[in-house]
């Protein structure tokens, strides 16, 4: 018999529990307390870290969940570290349900089911009252757009973090130049397009390089999302923050 959804503000279910675990683990090191928005289209998070150096824009699509019930917009405040403490026990073949009951609107519930073990675990976590400051992202036309294997990007960032604090990224035609300098060494890596590697969907003219300098500390945090997808999407524009997009498995 189908569950009565009338008692829930939110009730969603996914078999992609591993992707949710990886996502929350990555977010907890960038965001502490943040708002998450549920509505009929999906799950959304737009927030900056405490230093306002990083903007996170996450969207999970309702139609990609096994079931999705959220008849009206619901905004909740959560502590990401506490959420990860509950969800880190999940394994890839678990089924995760996330719910908020009408009679307990100040708690979020996580139900983890494992068919193989015939087990069910339910957590309920207190929600936070966080002011809802809406962040609007204006449309931007980028000068360079590319895809790159996420595992290779992670390795490059890790290697350069051992040398310096910042990475200079320069797009020249169909090549990508990565540089970093430290007290004891420097590194320069030049990447060109390959069938299974770097691929430009929009390239700059060779005489008009597109470049910027970015913090390796934050890029290293981003690479915790590596296992979510095989490719990252990178968007570069002069005098503009670096945009890196990870697909959250098949969810968004």
Annotated model-derived regions:
Residues 1-28, 33-162, 168-252:
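DNA polymerase sliding clamps and clamp-related checkpoint/processivity subunits
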């Amino acid at each position: 018999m189908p569950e009565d959804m009338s008692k829930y503000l939110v009730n969603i279910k996914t078999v992609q529990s591993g992707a949710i675990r990886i996502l929350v683990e990555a977010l907890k090191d960038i965001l502490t307390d943040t708002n998450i928005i549920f509505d009929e289209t999906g799950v959304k998070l737009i927030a900056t870290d405490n230093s306002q150096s990083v903007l996170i824009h996450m969207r999970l699509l309702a139609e990609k969940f096994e079931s999705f019930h959220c008849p009206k917009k619901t905004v909740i405040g959560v502590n990401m570290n506490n959420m990860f403490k509950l969800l880190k026990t999940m394994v890839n073949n678990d089924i995760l349900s996330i719910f908020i009951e009408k009679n307990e609107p100040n708690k979020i519930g996580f139900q983890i089911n494992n068919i193989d073990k015939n087990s069910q675990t339910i957590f309920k976590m207190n929600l936070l009252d966080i002011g809802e400051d809406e962040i609007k992202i204006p449309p931007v036309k980028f000068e360079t757009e590319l895809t790159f294997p996420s595992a290779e990007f992670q390795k490059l960032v890790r290697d350069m973090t051992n040398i310096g604090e910042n990475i200079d990224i320069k797009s020249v035609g169909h090549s990508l130049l990565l540089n970093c300098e430290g007290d004891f060494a420097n590194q320069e890596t030049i990447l060109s397009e390959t069938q299974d590697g770097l691929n430009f969907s929009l390239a700059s003219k060779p005489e008009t390089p597109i470049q910027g300098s970015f913090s390796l500390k934050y890029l290293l945090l981003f690479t915790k999302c590596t296992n979510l997808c095989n490719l990252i999407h990178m968007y570069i524009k002069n005098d503009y923050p670096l945009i890196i997009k990870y697909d959250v498995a098949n969810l968004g």
